[in-house]
Amino acid sequence: MSGSALFNTGNVWLNPASIAQNSSLTTSLFYSPSPFQLPQLSHFGLTTIKNFDRMNFAAGFTSFGFSLYRETVFSFTAATMFTESFGAGINVHANHLSIQSYGSATTTVVDLGTIISPIENFNIGFSLNNIGRSSFGADDDIPQIFITGFSYMVMEKTTIAVDIVHDVRYSTGYRAGIEFSPHEIIVIRAGTQSEQSQLYGGIGIKIFSFQIDYGIATHTELGLTNSIGITFSN
């Protein structure tokens, strides 16, 4: 489940502190072949996370678009737990934009994040994406985003997460989700966000060291988006 207050390796793009508690070699990939039923918007990502003593490091890659327009991001993340209840991390991205017939551009983007656990089963996360307001040349073509998140494990098998998201270009919005595990190998997820009134659903299945995730998003005007993810932990 996504959320800036969750210690979850899949959330490293939201909050670099999310990998601070990772203790194993973890590799994950996701693929959305046709967002909003448009193959030109295909999105792919791959991340590997490794623990070294008290530090966790991650290297990642994402690609969005098609041959005429493509955004590619190479990322490096470092995170650690300073205390049992406080973790922090940093992302450094190399963002590359290529537009056929117009050329290409590259810039560096830095994200900072923390996660605090003031009481058992309750986390608060803070992250600032694109702290230096980097761009490809036009103002705000790479957004600066402030996220404040909360997560609470209501019961042993149920977690609720809420993010308050402020993109400096727009009004403040929210994301909310719930994750329920009816069995040790199955996870069911649902969520919503204020932007574009989207609804989300998904399921994850754990098989030995692998977890396979499927997600679907609905948009009131643009239709469905399907995505799949695979995570390996050793």
Where in the sequence are the language-model features?
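Subset of outer-membrane beta-barrel
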Residues: 1-234
